[in-house]
Amino acid sequence: MMEASPGLSIAITFAVILLALTGFSIYTSFGPPSKQLEDPFEDHED
């Protein structure tokens, strides 16, 4: 088995974290938790 270089390991770790944060953000924005989000512009009355 080949040994991975430290740079490759860091790049893969960074990519996985970025994808996880992106997925969680999309889930929060459009999934079931989105019903709890409030729109501050709708709440503000002129």
Curated annotation (Swiss-Prot):
Record-level GO BP terms: photosynthesis
GO cellular component terms attached to this protein's record: plasma membrane-derived thylakoid membrane
Domain of life: Bacteria
Keywords from the named record: Membrane, Thylakoid, Transmembrane, Transmembrane helix
Keyword Cytoplasm: no
Localization, UniProt: Cellular thylakoid membrane
Record flagged with keyword Transmembrane: yes
Membrane topology: Single-pass membrane protein
Pfam families per UniProt: PsbN (PF02468)
Similarity-based family: Belongs to the PsbN family.
NCBIfam families, A to Z: PRK13183.1
Function: May play a role in photosystem I and II biogenesis.
Protein name per Swiss-Prot or TrEMBL: Protein PsbN
Gene (name only): psbN
